[in-house]
Amino acid sequence: MSRPTEHLPVLAGDGFDLRPPRPGEVARVVEAITSDPVASAWWGADPAVVMRWFEEDDVDVLLVCTDDGPAGIITYTEVNDPDYRSAGIDIGLLSDRIGRGMGSAALRLLARWLFEERGHHRLTIDPAVANERAVRAYEKVGFKRIGVARQYERGNDGTYHDNLLMDMLAGEVLGPGEG
């Protein structure tokens, strides 16, 4: 990872942490994502494509870690203009960690930090329309559907796919079982 990580938070969740990658972890995480059938379907099977997430100047990447090691990644991009104080979020978990509530809990933890500590008033996320499991998880956290962006993102098959635009305002984060 070529970007500095000193500014990134370490956030403690229930059974997991969100933290910056440690030296040597990025290559292992990229390999895990690109070889995982579920994660690679959404994040890509090409290691160079996934590695770009870790190298983008405006994207901050945290690992979702358990005692067993990295379970996935969660990213955020901040808009720091005081008139548009918002952030975009994305998350990708390895297939053996999906369906256990970890993704929703990680999103909830990061959302609260972005609202309470970073002062954002709005968060956005933009899953593929076809990624119904992710959409349900985001709604459980408090994200609301606001529209569809047609042919928004090129998929692994080389064609453009629609994405669902979702947002959440400060004060709308839902606790477990509320969504």
Regions found by a protein language model. Name each.
Residues 16, 69-73, 161:
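Glycine-rich phosphate/pyrophosphate-binding loop shared by adenosine-nucleotide-utilizing enzymes
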Residues 138, 143, 166:
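Conserved active-site tyrosine of GNAT-family acetyltransferases
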Residues 103, 107, 131-134, 151-156:
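Short glycine/proline-centered loop/turn elements that form peptide/ligand docking sites
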Residues 40-98, 113, 169-173:
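Acetyl-CoA-dependent GNAT
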Residues 1-52, 171-179:
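A short, well-structured alpha-helix characteristic of acyl/acetyltransferase catalytic modules
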Residues 124-127, 144-161:
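Conserved catalytic-core motifs of GNAT/GCN5-like acyltransferases
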Residues 116-126:
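Conserved GNAT acetyl-CoA-binding A-motif
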Residues 100-113, 136-140:
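Conserved acetyl-CoA-binding loop-helix of GNAT-fold acetyltransferases
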